[in-house]
Structures are given as C-alpha cells and as structure tokens.
Amino acid sequence: MADNRTFTMIKPDAVENGHIGGILDQITASGFRIVALKLTQMTQRDAETFYAVHNERPFFGELVEFMTRGPIVAAILEKDNAVEDFRTLIGATNPEDAAEGTIRKKYAKSIGENAVHGSDSDENAQIEGAFHFAGREMF
C-alpha cells in the first residue's frame, strides 16, 4: 500500500449505534475513495494478533474483549497523503480532545469506545490492510 492508501475500522461501538453510514459518508465527502470494504467479526485470536503491539499494556484484555463483542467494518481508503489526512479526519483518540467535526467528536463515546481505528503510518496501513483483505479484494 503506497502513501496514498490507509486502513480503517469502524469499531463495534459505532456499528452497534448505527453510525456506519454517517462515518462512510464523512469519509467519502472528505475526498477518500473506498478501495476495499467489508463487514466482519474479529475473533479473539484476530484481535490479539492485530493489537499485538499493545499486549503488555494494562488495557489489552479490555481492548480485545471490546473489538470482539460485535461486527466491525474494515476498509482501505485511497487519497493523496491518506494516512495523515485520515488521522486528521478522525481526530484525537479521546473524543473529549478531538476537534469539532471530526469522526470521533461526532460518533465516539469515550477513549475506549472511540468509533474508529486509523493507521498511524504508511507501513502500518499496509500491514493492517493486508491483515483484513486479500489482494483480490482491493480495487
């Protein structure tokens, strides 16, 4: 995945609260093109693997439990400067600190239930996208 692609997940809290459409609308209205999209459910093993970087952190167990409690929407997005622009669009991890109009300000409940994941680097965007999508699933 080049620097014009990023990976995102709409997390279980936002799916449960019916925010898929609103979030996808905001993403596309911000100039991103969706090149891969799926509704899926992470298993415990999936979540533990995906978030392995956090496995020594005190919140790891809660994170895995949260990410497996319901379906997620995984997507690969395309736009120039995709990773940085998407991080700006979603806002700060804690919705209380997020700028007005950002996805997390609009849809997140708390720092733990913060509606969306966005890759933090081009390298991680490639790794995370490949975790959820086979090459034939990207257009």
UniProtKB/Swiss-Prot annotation:
Single GO term (MF): metal ion binding
Catalytic activity: a 2'-deoxyribonucleoside 5'-diphosphate + ATP = a 2'-deoxyribonucleoside 5'-triphosphate + ADP; a ribonucleoside 5'-diphosphate + ATP = a ribonucleoside 5'-triphosphate + ADP
GO BP, sorted A to Z: CTP biosynthetic process; GTP biosynthetic process; UTP biosynthetic process
GO cellular component labels: cytoplasm
Catalytic activity, EC: 2.7.4.6
Needed co-factor(s): Mg(2+)
Primary residence: cytoplasm
Quaternary organization: Homotetramer.
Functional description taken from the UniProt entry: Major role in the synthesis of nucleoside triphosphates other than ATP. The ATP gamma phosphate is transferred to the NDP beta phosphate via a ping-pong mechanism, using a phosphorylated active-site intermediate.
HAMAP family: NDP_kinase (MF_00451)
Name of the protein in question: Nucleoside diphosphate kinase
Source organism per UniProt: Christiangramia forsetii (strain DSM 17595 / CGMCC 1.15422 / KT0803)
Classification lineage: Bacteria, Pseudomonadati, Bacteroidota, Flavobacteriia, Flavobacteriales
Gene field: ndk
